Protein backbone atom coordinates (compact mmCIF):
# COMPACT_ATOMS: atom_id res chain seq x y z
CA UNK A 1 0.00 0.00 0.00
CA UNK A 2 2.87 2.38 0.79
CA UNK A 3 4.36 1.85 -2.67
CA UNK A 4 0.97 2.36 -4.30
CA UNK A 5 0.46 5.68 -2.53
CA UNK A 6 3.90 6.86 -3.63
CA UNK A 7 3.04 6.12 -7.26
CA UNK A 8 -0.38 7.69 -6.75
CA UNK A 9 1.22 10.93 -5.56
CA UNK A 10 3.81 10.81 -8.35
CA UNK A 11 1.17 10.41 -11.07
CA UNK A 12 -1.00 13.22 -9.72
CA UNK A 13 2.06 15.47 -9.33
CA UNK A 14 2.70 15.06 -13.06
CA UNK A 15 -0.70 16.64 -13.64
CA UNK A 16 -0.79 19.41 -11.01
CA UNK A 17 0.29 20.52 -7.54
CA UNK A 18 0.12 17.89 -4.81
CA UNK A 19 0.45 18.07 -1.03
CA UNK A 20 0.87 14.82 0.88
CA UNK A 21 -0.02 14.54 4.56
CA UNK A 22 1.53 11.35 5.91
CA UNK A 23 3.24 9.65 8.84
CA UNK A 24 6.62 10.68 10.22
CA UNK A 25 9.47 9.71 7.90
CA UNK A 26 7.42 9.83 4.70
CA UNK A 27 9.35 12.81 3.33
CA UNK A 28 12.39 10.61 2.70
CA UNK A 29 10.36 8.46 0.29
CA UNK A 30 8.17 11.08 -1.37
CA UNK A 31 8.47 11.56 -5.15
CA UNK A 32 9.96 14.73 -6.59
CA UNK A 33 7.65 17.69 -6.96
CA UNK A 34 5.39 16.75 -4.04
CA UNK A 35 4.93 18.97 -1.00
CA UNK A 36 5.08 16.83 2.16
CA UNK A 37 3.66 17.46 5.63
CA UNK A 38 4.47 14.86 8.28
CA UNK A 39 1.82 14.23 10.92
CA UNK A 40 2.26 12.42 14.22
CA UNK A 41 4.73 9.88 15.55
CA UNK A 42 4.28 6.62 17.40
CA UNK A 43 0.74 5.43 18.14
CA UNK A 44 -1.89 5.27 15.42
CA UNK A 45 -4.15 7.75 17.19
CA UNK A 46 -1.34 10.31 17.15
CA UNK A 47 -0.99 9.98 13.40
CA UNK A 48 -4.75 10.16 12.78
CA UNK A 49 -5.20 13.24 14.97
CA UNK A 50 -2.10 14.85 13.42
CA UNK A 51 -3.32 14.02 9.91
CA UNK A 52 -6.67 15.63 10.68
CA UNK A 53 -5.07 18.82 12.03
CA UNK A 54 -2.49 19.13 9.27
CA UNK A 55 -5.02 18.21 6.61
CA UNK A 56 -7.45 20.88 7.76
CA UNK A 57 -4.68 23.52 7.86
CA UNK A 58 -3.32 22.62 4.45
CA UNK A 59 -6.73 22.42 2.80
CA UNK A 60 -7.80 25.82 4.14
CA UNK A 61 -4.53 27.42 2.99
CA UNK A 62 -4.37 25.91 -0.48
CA UNK A 63 -8.03 25.42 -1.47
CA UNK A 64 -7.46 22.14 -3.34
CA UNK A 65 -9.82 20.74 -5.94
CA UNK A 66 -9.78 17.27 -4.38
CA UNK A 67 -8.71 15.80 -1.05
CA UNK A 68 -7.89 12.14 -1.60
CA UNK A 69 -7.44 9.51 1.12
CA UNK A 70 -4.88 6.89 0.12
CA UNK A 71 -6.83 4.22 2.06
CA UNK A 72 -9.99 3.83 4.07
CA UNK A 73 -8.11 4.54 7.29
CA UNK A 74 -7.69 8.23 6.48
CA UNK A 75 -11.09 8.69 4.83
CA UNK A 76 -12.64 10.63 7.76
CA UNK A 77 -9.71 13.07 7.80
CA UNK A 78 -9.91 13.56 4.03
CA UNK A 79 -13.68 14.13 4.12
CA UNK A 80 -13.44 16.71 6.91
CA UNK A 81 -10.56 18.55 5.20
CA UNK A 82 -12.51 18.58 1.93
CA UNK A 83 -15.62 19.98 3.55
CA UNK A 84 -13.60 22.66 5.36
CA UNK A 85 -12.16 23.90 2.06
CA UNK A 86 -14.96 23.31 -0.42
CA UNK A 87 -13.05 20.53 -2.18
CA UNK A 88 -14.34 17.19 -3.41
CA UNK A 89 -13.62 14.23 -1.10
CA UNK A 90 -12.28 10.98 -2.55
CA UNK A 91 -10.76 7.73 -1.30
CA UNK A 92 -8.83 4.83 -2.83
CA UNK A 93 -10.12 1.60 -1.29
CA UNK A 94 -8.62 -1.87 -0.94
CA UNK A 95 -10.58 -4.93 0.11
CA UNK A 96 -9.53 -4.80 3.76
CA UNK A 97 -10.57 -1.15 3.97
CA UNK A 98 -14.12 -2.42 3.67
CA UNK A 99 -14.07 -5.75 5.51
CA UNK A 100 -12.23 -4.84 8.73
CA UNK A 101 -14.53 -6.19 11.41
CA UNK A 102 -13.69 -3.91 14.33
CA UNK A 103 -16.99 -2.44 15.63
CA UNK A 104 -15.51 1.07 16.01
CA UNK A 105 -14.24 1.05 12.43
CA UNK A 106 -17.63 0.00 11.13
CA UNK A 107 -19.44 2.53 13.32
CA UNK A 108 -17.23 5.55 12.55
CA UNK A 109 -15.38 4.87 9.29
CA UNK A 110 -18.09 3.28 7.14
CA UNK A 111 -20.39 6.35 7.24
CA UNK A 112 -17.50 8.51 5.99
CA UNK A 113 -16.85 6.06 3.14
CA UNK A 114 -20.50 6.32 2.13
CA UNK A 115 -20.29 10.15 2.10
CA UNK A 116 -17.31 10.37 -0.24
CA UNK A 117 -17.91 12.19 -3.53
CA UNK A 118 -15.76 9.63 -5.35
CA UNK A 119 -14.72 6.14 -4.26
CA UNK A 120 -11.96 4.52 -6.32
CA UNK A 121 -11.54 0.77 -5.77
CA UNK A 122 -8.76 -1.56 -6.84
CA UNK A 123 -10.90 -4.34 -8.37
CA UNK A 124 -14.38 -5.51 -9.25
CA UNK A 125 -14.33 -7.63 -6.09
CA UNK A 126 -13.66 -4.58 -3.91
CA UNK A 127 -16.40 -2.76 -5.83
CA UNK A 128 -18.86 -5.42 -4.72
CA UNK A 129 -17.69 -5.10 -1.13
CA UNK A 130 -18.06 -1.32 -1.27
CA UNK A 131 -21.59 -1.57 -2.61
CA UNK A 132 -22.30 -4.08 0.15
CA UNK A 133 -21.72 -1.46 2.86
CA UNK A 134 -23.97 1.04 1.17
CA UNK A 135 -21.65 3.07 -1.07
CA UNK A 136 -23.67 4.32 -4.04
CA UNK A 137 -22.60 2.49 -7.24
CA UNK A 138 -22.57 5.73 -9.27
CA UNK A 139 -19.83 7.11 -7.01
CA UNK A 140 -17.52 4.13 -7.53
CA UNK A 141 -14.80 3.77 -10.17
CA UNK A 142 -12.67 0.63 -10.60
CA UNK A 143 -8.99 1.45 -11.18
CA UNK A 144 -6.52 -1.39 -10.49
CA UNK A 145 -3.02 -0.46 -9.28
CA UNK A 146 -0.27 0.04 -11.82
CA UNK A 147 2.98 -1.78 -12.43
CA UNK A 148 6.48 -0.64 -13.40
CA UNK A 149 7.13 -2.13 -16.82
CA UNK A 150 10.63 -3.58 -17.27
CA UNK A 151 12.87 -2.66 -20.17
CA UNK A 152 12.26 -4.95 -23.17
CA UNK A 153 14.85 -7.68 -23.67
CA UNK A 154 15.44 -10.17 -26.47
CA UNK A 155 15.29 -13.94 -26.07
CA UNK A 156 19.08 -14.31 -25.90
CA UNK A 157 19.34 -11.92 -22.95
CA UNK A 158 16.31 -13.53 -21.30
CA UNK A 159 17.96 -16.96 -21.43
CA UNK A 160 21.26 -15.56 -20.14
CA UNK A 161 19.61 -13.83 -17.15
CA UNK A 162 17.59 -16.97 -16.47
CA UNK A 163 20.70 -19.14 -16.41
CA UNK A 164 22.68 -16.74 -14.20
CA UNK A 165 19.85 -16.43 -11.67
CA UNK A 166 19.51 -20.21 -11.41
CA UNK A 167 23.24 -20.49 -10.78
CA UNK A 168 23.15 -17.82 -8.03
CA UNK A 169 20.43 -19.66 -6.16
CA UNK A 170 21.61 -23.21 -6.80
CA UNK A 171 18.58 -24.25 -8.85
CA UNK A 172 18.88 -26.92 -11.51
CA UNK A 173 17.41 -27.16 -14.99
CA UNK A 174 13.96 -28.53 -14.10
CA UNK A 175 10.77 -26.46 -14.22
CA UNK A 176 10.62 -23.62 -11.68
CA UNK A 177 7.40 -22.49 -10.04
CA UNK A 178 7.49 -19.12 -8.29
CA UNK A 179 5.56 -17.69 -5.35
CA UNK A 180 5.97 -13.97 -4.54
CA UNK A 181 4.38 -12.22 -1.58
CA UNK A 182 3.96 -12.12 2.15
CA UNK A 183 3.46 -15.51 3.78
CA UNK A 184 -0.09 -15.25 5.10
CA UNK A 185 -2.98 -17.68 5.29
CA UNK A 186 -4.76 -15.77 2.52
CA UNK A 187 -1.90 -16.40 0.08
CA UNK A 188 -2.38 -20.16 0.54
CA UNK A 189 1.20 -21.31 0.06
CA UNK A 190 1.04 -24.00 2.76
CA UNK A 191 -2.08 -25.46 1.15
CA UNK A 192 -0.40 -25.36 -2.26
CA UNK A 193 2.67 -27.21 -0.98
CA UNK A 194 0.49 -29.77 0.79
CA UNK A 195 -2.23 -30.38 -1.81
CA UNK A 196 -1.02 -29.23 -5.24
CA UNK A 197 2.76 -29.49 -5.49
CA UNK A 198 2.80 -33.30 -4.96
CA UNK A 199 0.41 -33.71 -7.92
CA UNK A 200 2.69 -31.62 -10.13
CA UNK A 201 5.80 -33.48 -8.93
CA UNK A 202 4.21 -36.78 -9.98
CA UNK A 203 4.27 -35.54 -13.60
CA UNK A 204 7.41 -33.38 -13.40
CA UNK A 205 9.80 -35.08 -10.94
CA UNK A 206 12.39 -32.27 -11.11
CA UNK A 207 10.00 -29.37 -10.51
CA UNK A 208 11.18 -26.75 -7.99
CA UNK A 209 9.26 -24.11 -6.02
CA UNK A 210 11.02 -20.78 -5.37
CA UNK A 211 9.45 -18.71 -2.58
CA UNK A 212 10.06 -14.96 -2.32
CA UNK A 213 8.73 -13.20 0.77
CA UNK A 214 8.51 -13.42 4.55
CA UNK A 215 5.66 -13.51 7.07
CA UNK A 216 4.24 -10.01 7.66
CA UNK A 217 5.45 -7.97 10.61
CA UNK A 218 1.99 -6.53 11.02
CA UNK A 219 -1.00 -6.53 8.71
CA UNK A 220 -4.74 -6.03 9.14
CA UNK A 221 -6.47 -9.40 9.59
CA UNK A 222 -3.37 -11.23 8.29
CA UNK A 223 -2.49 -14.60 9.75
CA UNK A 224 1.07 -15.65 9.11
CA UNK A 225 2.35 -18.89 7.62
CA UNK A 226 5.96 -19.36 8.67
CA UNK A 227 8.67 -21.00 6.57
CA UNK A 228 8.89 -23.68 9.25
CA UNK A 229 5.18 -24.51 8.93
CA UNK A 230 5.46 -24.62 5.14
CA UNK A 231 8.54 -26.86 5.30
CA UNK A 232 6.76 -29.21 7.71
CA UNK A 233 3.81 -29.46 5.33
CA UNK A 234 6.21 -30.11 2.44
CA UNK A 235 8.00 -32.80 4.47
CA UNK A 236 4.74 -34.61 5.20
CA UNK A 237 3.80 -34.38 1.51
CA UNK A 238 7.19 -35.69 0.38
CA UNK A 239 8.22 -32.53 -1.51
CA UNK A 240 10.48 -30.79 1.01
CA UNK A 241 13.49 -31.00 -1.31
CA UNK A 242 11.63 -28.96 -3.95
CA UNK A 243 11.44 -25.77 -1.86
CA UNK A 244 13.83 -22.79 -2.09
CA UNK A 245 13.15 -19.88 0.30
CA UNK A 246 14.76 -16.63 -0.84
CA UNK A 247 13.11 -14.36 1.76
CA UNK A 248 12.98 -10.66 0.93
CA UNK A 249 14.97 -9.60 -2.11
CA UNK A 250 15.45 -6.24 -3.82
CA UNK A 251 13.59 -5.20 -6.96
CA UNK A 252 16.52 -5.86 -9.27
CA UNK A 253 16.91 -9.45 -8.07
CA UNK A 254 13.15 -9.97 -8.22
CA UNK A 255 13.23 -9.07 -11.92
CA UNK A 256 15.82 -11.80 -12.47
CA UNK A 257 13.75 -14.28 -10.46
CA UNK A 258 10.69 -13.56 -12.61
CA UNK A 259 12.77 -14.35 -15.70
CA UNK A 260 14.16 -17.51 -14.09
CA UNK A 261 10.76 -19.04 -13.39
CA UNK A 262 8.42 -20.91 -15.71
CA UNK A 263 5.11 -20.29 -13.91
CA UNK A 264 3.99 -17.96 -11.13
CA UNK A 265 1.60 -19.72 -8.74
CA UNK A 266 -0.97 -17.66 -6.81
CA UNK A 267 -3.11 -20.06 -4.74
CA UNK A 268 -5.10 -17.35 -2.94
CA UNK A 269 -7.64 -18.64 -0.42
CA UNK A 270 -11.16 -17.34 0.14
CA UNK A 271 -11.11 -16.28 3.80
CA UNK A 272 -14.09 -14.36 5.24
CA UNK A 273 -13.04 -10.86 6.30
CA UNK A 274 -9.63 -11.16 4.61
CA UNK A 275 -10.15 -10.71 0.85
CA UNK A 276 -7.52 -10.53 -1.87
CA UNK A 277 -8.28 -7.05 -3.15
CA UNK A 278 -6.44 -7.33 -6.47
CA UNK A 279 -3.23 -9.29 -7.01
CA UNK A 280 -0.66 -6.89 -8.45
CA UNK A 281 2.00 -9.61 -8.37
CA UNK A 282 0.19 -11.37 -11.24
CA UNK A 283 0.52 -8.21 -13.34
CA UNK A 284 4.21 -7.92 -12.44
CA UNK A 285 4.71 -11.52 -13.51
CA UNK A 286 2.94 -10.92 -16.83
CA UNK A 287 5.10 -7.83 -17.43
CA UNK A 288 8.11 -10.16 -17.34
CA UNK A 289 6.51 -12.73 -19.64
CA UNK A 290 5.68 -15.09 -16.78
CA UNK A 291 2.18 -16.66 -16.71
CA UNK A 292 0.20 -17.03 -13.49
CA UNK A 293 -1.96 -19.92 -12.36
CA UNK A 294 -4.33 -18.73 -9.65
CA UNK A 295 -7.54 -19.50 -7.88
CA UNK A 296 -10.32 -17.21 -9.11
CA UNK A 297 -10.74 -15.56 -5.71
CA UNK A 298 -11.42 -11.90 -4.93
CA UNK A 299 -9.74 -9.34 -7.15
CA UNK A 300 -7.43 -11.93 -8.73
CA UNK A 301 -9.98 -12.34 -11.53
CA UNK A 302 -9.08 -8.80 -12.66
CA UNK A 303 -5.33 -9.45 -12.46
CA UNK A 304 -5.16 -12.63 -14.58
CA UNK A 305 -6.51 -12.75 -18.13
CA UNK A 306 -7.47 -16.41 -18.46
CA UNK A 307 -5.75 -17.92 -21.47
CA UNK A 308 -3.67 -14.77 -22.08
CA UNK A 309 -1.59 -14.06 -18.96
CA UNK A 310 -2.28 -17.35 -17.20
CA UNK A 311 -5.07 -19.62 -16.06
CA UNK A 312 -7.80 -19.23 -13.45
CA UNK A 313 -9.02 -22.19 -11.41
CA UNK A 314 -12.17 -22.53 -9.26
CA UNK A 315 -11.24 -21.86 -5.61
CA UNK A 316 -10.25 -24.98 -3.73
CA UNK A 317 -9.81 -27.19 -6.82
CA UNK A 318 -6.35 -28.59 -6.05
CA UNK A 319 -6.40 -31.13 -8.88
CA UNK A 320 -7.54 -28.47 -11.34
CA UNK A 321 -4.75 -26.15 -10.20
CA UNK A 322 -2.16 -28.88 -10.74
CA UNK A 323 -3.63 -29.69 -14.16
CA UNK A 324 -3.38 -26.04 -15.30
CA UNK A 325 0.25 -25.83 -14.15
CA UNK A 326 1.11 -29.06 -15.97
CA UNK A 327 -0.72 -27.82 -19.06
CA UNK A 328 1.31 -24.58 -19.16
CA UNK A 329 4.57 -26.44 -18.62
CA UNK A 330 3.73 -28.61 -21.62
CA UNK A 331 2.29 -25.82 -23.80
CA UNK A 332 3.53 -22.38 -22.69
CA UNK A 333 1.44 -19.32 -23.48
CA UNK A 334 2.90 -16.87 -26.05
CA UNK A 335 4.76 -14.00 -24.42
CA UNK A 336 3.68 -11.06 -26.61
CA UNK A 337 -0.04 -11.07 -25.66
CA UNK A 338 1.01 -11.41 -22.03
CA UNK A 339 3.26 -8.35 -22.25
CA UNK A 340 0.51 -6.39 -24.01
CA UNK A 341 -1.96 -7.24 -21.23
CA UNK A 342 0.49 -6.05 -18.57
CA UNK A 343 1.20 -2.83 -20.50
CA UNK A 344 -2.40 -1.78 -19.90
CA UNK A 345 -1.53 -1.50 -16.20
CA UNK A 346 1.42 0.89 -16.55
CA UNK A 347 1.65 3.65 -13.95
CA UNK A 348 1.02 6.43 -16.52
CA UNK A 349 -2.15 4.61 -17.61
CA UNK A 350 -3.15 4.34 -13.94
CA UNK A 351 -2.55 8.09 -13.54
CA UNK A 352 -4.72 8.93 -16.55
CA UNK A 353 -7.59 6.81 -15.23
CA UNK A 354 -7.28 8.23 -11.73
CA UNK A 355 -7.22 11.85 -12.92
CA UNK A 356 -10.31 11.20 -15.05
CA UNK A 357 -12.13 9.54 -12.15
CA UNK A 358 -11.36 12.51 -9.89
CA UNK A 359 -12.39 15.04 -12.54
CA UNK A 360 -8.95 16.63 -12.59
CA UNK A 361 -7.41 18.56 -15.46
CA UNK A 362 -5.38 21.18 -13.61
CA UNK A 363 -5.58 20.79 -9.88
CA UNK A 364 -4.06 20.75 -6.43
CA UNK A 365 -4.77 17.47 -4.64
CA UNK A 366 -4.28 16.68 -0.97
CA UNK A 367 -3.37 13.05 -0.27
CA UNK A 368 -3.64 11.39 3.12
CA UNK A 369 -1.40 8.33 3.56
Please describe what each predicted stretch is.
Residues 3-49, 125-126:
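N-terminal strand-loop element at the rim of the active site
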Residues 160, 171-187, 193, 197-198, ...:
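Conserved donor-binding/catalytic core segment of Leloir-type glycosyltransferases
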Amino acid sequence: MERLNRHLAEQLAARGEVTVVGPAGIAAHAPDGVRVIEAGRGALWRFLSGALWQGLRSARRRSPDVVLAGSGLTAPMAWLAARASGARAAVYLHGLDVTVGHPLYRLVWHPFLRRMDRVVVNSSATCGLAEGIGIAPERIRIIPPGVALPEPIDETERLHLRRMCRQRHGIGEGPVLLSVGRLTSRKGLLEFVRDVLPLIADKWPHVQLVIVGDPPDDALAARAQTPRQIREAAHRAGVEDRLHFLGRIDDEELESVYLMADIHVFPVQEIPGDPEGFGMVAIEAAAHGLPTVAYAAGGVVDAVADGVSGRLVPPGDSAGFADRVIELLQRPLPIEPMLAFAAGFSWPAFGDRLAAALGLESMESGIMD
